[in-house]
Amino acid sequence: MLIFWAVLGGFLLDALFGDPAWLPHPVVLMGRCISALEKHLRTALPKTPRGELAGGAAVAAVLPLGTLAVTGLACWAAARLHPALGLALQMLWCGQALAAKGLAQESRNVYKELAKGALPAARRAVARIVGRDTQNLTAAGVTRAAVETVAENASDGVIAPLLYMLLGGAPLALTYKAINTMDSMLGYKNEKYLYFGRCAAKLDDAANWLPSRLAALLWVAAAALTGNSARGAWRIWRRDRRRHASPNSAQTESACAGALGVQLAGPAYYFGEYYDKPTIGDPLREIEPRDILRANRMMYAESLLALVLGLAVRLMLIL
């Protein structure tokens, strides 16, 4: 029952408080470790494709295994001191592994600026949650970027960590976050990270394969619950779920596009370079700022569905 209560408590902590700025966050420490490992390995190993592959593989092995070992040991030690302390630590880390409230808050900030007609401020707000260049985006481009990141992060910021914590508590959820953080820092297909980041990207693809597909199916159900088009979500997911360089990113994006009846993705600039990405969905209507709020409602609905279904399965296995 420890994992059951840890997951439920962690979900409620995230829903109520999100990630307070004053509270140290494990992902920040993971980021510092990745940067330190990268700096050391780039210095120690040959600056060749093989050397960079070896360095990236070392990071991709050390960080997840180290995270699992350290967090697992910490949870075990806390539980040995007192069961309530062990549960409290697991709840805290489960809450920190989830990003539903933070994602909703950041995307809502984008909506607020767009609603005021403050395009420069909206560009700055969306730049906090997307990787693309935002300085020249139109209002529709800013809206599209925010909706896409809500849809994609519903999978790797909510459903995936929720699945892993249901399987192995906070240690496994934070191990997943370590893999996801590596990919966000190293998994670029540019000159700097083409080889060094390859293992991190492949590991993230593997870790997200099942969660992203579960998230897409849950998004279809969430569309029905929130008054959006479940039929459209299902149809566009079936058609466009592979229209992305990543095997996972278009899963929830396509379901979201279909649910809203808008077109997402398409060409974008990253670090000054133009990428001709395929579009996802049909432009049945023009995208509008309120679509950010609609995407958030679907994200919350699928999160609750995942929690209820996951805890129900967990309870049945225990009983």
Where are the model-predicted features located?
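Glycine-rich phosphate/dinucleotide-binding loop and adjoining beta-alpha-beta core of small-molecule
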Residues: 184
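Hydrophobic alpha-helical transmembrane segments
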Residues: 1-175, 179, 187-319
